[in-house]
Curated annotation (Swiss-Prot):
Keywords: Cell inner membrane, Cell membrane, Chaperone, Disulfide bond, Electron transport, Membrane, Oxidoreductase, Redox-active center, Transmembrane, Transmembrane helix, Transport. Residues 1-14, 65-71, 164-170 are cytoplasmic. This is Disulfide bond formation protein B 1. The gene is dsbB1. The chain crosses the membrane at residues 15-31, 50-64, 72-89, 145-163. GO terms for molecular function: electron transfer activity; protein-disulfide reductase activity. It is found in: Cell inner membrane. Belongs to the DsbB family. NCBIfam families: PRK02110.1.
Length: 170
């Protein structure tokens, strides 16, 4: 095997791991929603969309054989992860400052009118308020865990893009 083949195989493993991590995080969100009765707010649903996008892009990139296609999809993953970091940070700010609000009355109709909310209402319909603080897991609030997840994904993908930047030219 040459260096190119080894590098692309390593990259595929990373991308498959990212995809499966996103599936696990979404499964955890559904567990909290249906078993623990922790209703998702508009910002929670937006974060779910970002995790879905990251997972889809990761699985697509894992199936591509050329570096340029992988690079484009990894760039899309980085953009989605950055959006997730921003959304989770905003959500965490709202929960840590009791007087703040996510603007439920303006965000909820927008999020609920998106097509996936019509196709999969059990996963993408808003049912809670952003200000509602649920019990922390290991001392960290749910938006904090989401922020950590998005940040780790962003760092991993940006590091991968940086590591393989020369493969695009050659």
């Amino acid at each position: 095997m040459n260096d190119y083949t080894l590098a692309i195989r390593r990259e595929r493993r990373l991308l498959m791991l990212l995809g499966w991590v996103c599936i696990a995080l979404l499964a955890g969100a559904l567990y909290l929603q249906y078993v623990k009765n922790e209703d998702p707010c508009p910002l929670c649903i937006i974060q779910r969309y970002f995790f879905c996008a990251i997972g889809i892009f990761a699985f697509l990139a894992a199936g591509i054989r050329n570096w340029r296609g992988v690079w484009v999809l990894e760039l899309l993953i980085a953009i989605a992860a950055a959006g997730g970091v921003g959304t989770a940070a905003r959500h965490l700010t709202i929960q840590m400052n009791p007087g703040f609000s996510c603007g439920f009355d303006t965000l909820q109709p927008i999020v609920d009118s998106l097509p996936p909310a019509q196709w999969f209402p059990g996963m993408f319909k808003v049912a809670g308020l952003c200000e509602t603080v649920y019990p922390p897991i290991f001392g960290i609030l749910l938006p904090g865990w989401s922020l950590i997840g998005f940040a780790v994904i962003l760092i991993a993908v940006v590091a991968s893009l940086w590591r393989h930047r020369r493969k695009l030219v050659g």
